[in-house]
From Swiss-Prot:
It is found in: Cytoplasm. It catalyses: L-glutamate 5-semialdehyde + phosphate + NADP(+) = L-glutamyl 5-phosphate + NADPH + H(+). GO terms for cellular component: cytoplasm. GO terms for molecular function: glutamate-5-semialdehyde dehydrogenase activity; NADP binding. Belongs to the gamma-glutamyl phosphate reductase family. Pathway: Amino-acid biosynthesis; L-proline biosynthesis; L-glutamate 5-semialdehyde from L-glutamate: step 2/2. PROSITE patterns: PROA. Keywords: Amino-acid biosynthesis, Cytoplasm, NADP, Oxidoreductase, Proline biosynthesis. Coiled coil: none annotated. Its EC number is 1.2.1.41. This is Gamma-glutamyl phosphate reductase. Catalyzes the NADPH-dependent reduction of L-glutamate 5-phosphate into L-glutamate 5-semialdehyde and phosphate. The product spontaneously undergoes cyclization to form 1-pyrroline-5-carboxylate. It holds the Pfam family Aldedh.
Length: 415
C-alpha cells in the first residue's frame, strides 16, 4: 500500500502540471520518447528475454508468449506508434459547443483531462507504452499495473519513458508503474479513490470481472472478445473464406480475433469443406455442432462452453443456423459486445444484422480484426470498451477526456 500511496500522491501532483502543458511541449516530449525507445532497443530486448524465458519454463502456450514477446521490429512499431500519436489532434482545450442563454451568459463547453488514470493489464508490454503515451497526450497522469509475467519488460520500458519525459521537462510521476505485482496490491489499487479518477482494466475475462466486482474507483470496462463471423446464404464464397481465415488466424491471441463461425444451412455443405481446407493450413482445431460436424472431415463435438469461450488460440467453434435471425440471437446470447461480422450481399439482411446485434463494432463484409485504433484511423487506443458509458469501442484520445463548462458574464445574478 505504501507504494500505491506514494505513487498516487505523485500522480495527483503531476496531473496538475500536465493539465496546463501546451500541445507543443507534449508533442516535443513524445518525439524524444519515440527516439529514446529505439536507442534503448538492446536493453529492452534483453529484459524482455527474461520474461520470455520465465514463460517458457512455466509451459505458457506459444500464442500467449507471442503477446509477451518484444522484437526489434515490434519496438520500431511501438516507436512509430508514438509518432502517430504526436500527429493526432490534441483534444484538450477544444471548445465543443458555445451558446448564449436568456440571461445573456456566454456558455462554452470544453474538453479537459480526466485527471489520474489507473490501468491494470496483463501480458502485452506494448500496452505500457501505448497507455502512457495516450494518457500523457491528453494531459492525464497514469499509474500502470502490469502482470507479473511481463514485469522485467515493463520496468525497462518505464525507465526509458520516465527518463525521456523528465529530460523534456515533465515530472517523472506523470507516468508510473506499480512494481509490486501481488494480488493484494492490485486489490488496493482498485480502491484508490483518493488518487484515481478512473480505472481501466485490459486483459482476460477473469481480470476484468475481478476489477468490476472489487473496484470502488469508477471503471471503464474493456471487455473480452468472443467475436463471431456469420456467413449468410447470400455470402460470396471466396470472400467468406478470406475473411474467416484473416479474422481467426492472422493473430488469434488478440481480442478482435474471431472465435465462432455461424453459417447458414443453405451454403454450409458447399462452403464448410473449403473453409476447413483453408483453416487446416494454420492447424486450427474445429469444434462443431452436430450439423457442421456431419459436413466437416475433422472436427470435435462442440460443448456449451465452446460458444462462451474466448479461445485466444487456433481454435474455432462452428454452428450451422437456419436463418440470420438465429445467428443474431446466438450472438446476442453468447457475444461479449465487442466485434461481430456478417458476410452477405443481401442489403436488407446486412441492415437487420447491424441494427439488432449488440456490439461496439459491427462489420458487413469485413474482418473483425479492424477493431483497433490504428486500423480505424485514430491512432493507438487505450482499449476496446464494451460498455456504453463513458465510451464504447476503441478508446482513443477523445475518450480520455471529460468536459468543463466555462461561463462568461458581465455581472448577471439569478433572480
Amino acid at each position: 500500500m505504501t507504494e500505491l500511496i506514494k505513487k498516487g500522491s505523485g500522480a495527483k501532483e503531476a496531473s496538475q502540471f500536465l493539465a496546463q502543458a501546451t500541445t507543443k511541449h507534449k508533442n516535443a516530449a513524445l518525439l524524444n520518447l519515440s527516439n529514446d525507445l529505439l536507442i534503448h532497443t538492446a536493453t529492452l530486448l534483453q529484459e524482455n528475454e527474461k520474461d520470455i524465458l520465465r514463460a517458457k519454463q512455466k509451459g505458457t502456450p506459444e500464442t500467449m508468449i507471442d503477446r509477451l514477446r518484444l522484437t526489434e521490429e515490434r519496438i520500431k512499431e511501438i516507436s512509430e506508434a508514438v509518432k502517430q500519436v504526436v500527429a493526432l489532434k490534441d483534444p484538450i482545450g477544444e471548445v465543443t459547443n458555445m451558446w448564449k442563454n436568456e440571461a445573456e451568459l456566454t456558455i462554452g463547453k470544453t474538453r479537459v483531462p480526466l485527471g489520474v488514470i489507473g490501468i491494470i493489464y496483463e501480458s502485452r508490454p506494448n500496452v505500457t507504452v501505448d497507455a502512457s503515451v495516450l494518457c500523457f497526450k491528453t494531459g492525464n497522469a497514469v499509474i500502470l499495473r502490469g502482470g507479473s509475467d511481463a514485469i522485467d519488460s515493463n520496468k525497462a520500458l518505464m525507465s526509458v519513458i520516465q527518463d525521456s519525459l523528465e529530460a523534456s521537462g515533465f515530472p517523472r510521476s506523470s507516468v508510473q508503474l506499480i512494481e509490486d505485482t501481488s494480488r493484494e496490491t492490485a486489490q488496493d489499487m482498485m480502491r484508490l479513490n483518493r488518487f484515481l479518477d478512473v480505472l481501466i482494466p485490459r486483459g482476460g475475462a477473469r481480470l476484468i470481472q475481478t476489477v468490476l466486482e472489487n473496484a470502488t474507483v469508477p471503471v471503464i470496462e474493456t471487455g473480452t472478445g468472443n467475436c463471431h463471423i456469420y456467413v449468410d446464404k447470400a455470402a460470396e464464397k471466396q470472400m467468406a473464406i478470406d475473411i474467416l481465415v484473416n479474422a481467426k488466424c492472422s493473430r488469434p491471441s488478440v481480442c478482435n480475433a474471431a472465435e465462432t463461425l455461424l453459417i447458414h444451412r443453405d451454403v454450409a455443405e458447399d462452403y464448410l469443406p473449403a473453409m476447413e481446407t483453408a483453416l487446416k493450413e494454420y492447424d486450427v482445431e474445429l469444434r462443431a455442432d452436430e450439423r457442421a460436424k456431419g459436413i466437416l472431415q475433422e472436427a470435435k463435438a462442440a460443448t456449451e462452453s465452446d460458444w462462451e469461450d474466448e479461445f485466444l488460440d487456433f481454435i474455432l467453434a462452428i454452428k450451422v443456423v437456419d436463418s440470420a435471425e438465429e445467428a443474431i440471437d446466438h450472438i446476442n446470447k453468447y457475444g461479449t459486445k465487442h466485434s461481430e461480422a456478417i458476410i452477405s450481399n443481401d442489403y436488407a439482411t446486412g441492415q437487420a444484422f447491424h441494427q439488432k446485434v449488440d456490439a461496439a463494432a459491427v462489420y458487413i463484409n469485413a474482418s473483425t480484426r479492424f477493431t483497433d485504433g490504428f486500423a480505424m484511423g485514430f491512432g493507438a487506443e487505450i482499449g476496446i470498451s464494451t460498455q456504453k458509458l463513458h465510451a464504447r469501442g476503441p478508446m482513443g484520445l477523445t475518450e480520455l477526456t471529460s468536459t468543463k463548462y466555462i461561463i462568461f458574464g458581465d455581472g448577471q445574478i439569478r433572480n
